[in-house]
């Protein structure tokens, strides 16, 4: 896989997948499912595209019944394509996948999402917090409204979803929060995003300690540069041409390369002794976290 991508720019967050060139890769013939999540119910936020879509796809292949959220309007086409895909690959025993349009930045919406999933599937075994937005901006240009918007999307939503999902999660359940390599390395232009991703690391660690007595594991994934709709919606065309080249592997990841980390953390047979931990699929960008 080469580093960098054709110049392109999207003007609105969180970006659209179906217009990207090349389209992010969410599946691979090299991935061999083995019923790791047979009988499980998974809720994935931001599952219409990017890492979230790849996670939904892997979970469905592994036997889970999958629900995902998306932002109504710009993401409709991506969400419908993901739902179609999940219908195609779901196992015989899994229930039909569902998609839920919502703005996760508000508590009442997070409560409604959990209620819809429980009404459809009866419970939640795996909660994946993947939805996010980011903006390139100088500290002088950050205003209160957008700062609140980014924090609501990226970290408030995780608090609210966990709050309402917990009563429907039993011992052996798993919560997986998406943070980022920028929480460890920093980023000079993504200040709001970086702050939220640092908060997610601390939230994950504290929540893991709080829920350990209940037998619910809480972990995180801190991806490096990954080719998702957030990228052309955040960076200049010139930056897109070089995206991923700063890693020792000299390229960005595709979502399908990151999704197996979420499978591992969701599967009790694989990660039963993991809690409060962060996995780092980052191409070697950080090696001492």
Curated annotation (Swiss-Prot):
Substrate binds at residue 180. Residues 1-32 are annotated as: Disordered. The keyword Oxidoreductase applies. NAD(+) binds at residues 43-67. GO terms for molecular function: oxidoreductase activity, acting on CH-OH group of donors. The active site is at 193 (proton acceptor). Its EC number is 1.1.1.-. The keyword Magnesium does not apply. Pfam families: adh_short_C2. Keywords: Oxidoreductase. It comes from the Eukaryota. May act as a short alcohol-polyol-sugar dehydrogenase possibly related to carbohydrate metabolism and the acquisition of desiccation tolerance. May also be involved in signal transduction. Belongs to the short-chain dehydrogenases/reductases (SDR) family. This is Glucose and ribitol dehydrogenase homolog 2.
């Amino acid at each position: 896989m080469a580093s960098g991508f054709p110049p392109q720019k999207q003007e609105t967050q969180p970006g659209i997948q179906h217009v990207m060139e090349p389209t992010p890769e969410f599946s691979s013939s090299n991935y061999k499912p083995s019923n790791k999540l047979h009988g499980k119910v998974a809720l994935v936020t931001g599952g219409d595209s990017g890492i979230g879509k790849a996670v939904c796809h892997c979970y469905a292949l592994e036997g889970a019944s999958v629900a995902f959220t998306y932002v109504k309007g710009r993401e409709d086409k991506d969400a419908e394509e993901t739902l179609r895909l999940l219908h195609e690959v779901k196992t015989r025993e899994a229930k039909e996948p569902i998609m839920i349009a919502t703005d996760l930045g508000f508590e009442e919406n997070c409560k409604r999402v959990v209620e819809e999933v429980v009404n459809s599937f009866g419970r939640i075994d795996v909660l994946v917090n993947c939805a996010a937005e980011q903006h390139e901006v100088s500290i002088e240009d950050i205003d209160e409204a957008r700062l609140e918007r980014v924090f609501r999307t990226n970290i408030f939503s995780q608090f609210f979803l966990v709050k309402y999902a917990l009563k429907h999660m039993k011992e052996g359940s798993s919560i997986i929060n998406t943070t980022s390599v920028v929480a460890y390395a920093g980023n000079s232009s993504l200040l709001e995003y970086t702050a939220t991703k640092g908060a997610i690391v601390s939230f994950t660690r504290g929540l893991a300690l709080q829920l350990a007595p209940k037998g619910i594991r809480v972990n995180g994934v801190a991806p490096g540069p990954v080719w998702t709709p957030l990228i052309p919606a955040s960076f200049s065309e010139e930056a897109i041409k070089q995206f991923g080249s700063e890693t020792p592997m000299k390229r960005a990841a595709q979502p399908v390369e990151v999704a197996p980390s979420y499978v591992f953390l969701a599967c009790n047979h694989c990660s039963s002794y993991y809690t409060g931990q962060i996995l780092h699929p980052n191409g070697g960008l950080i090696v001492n976290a």
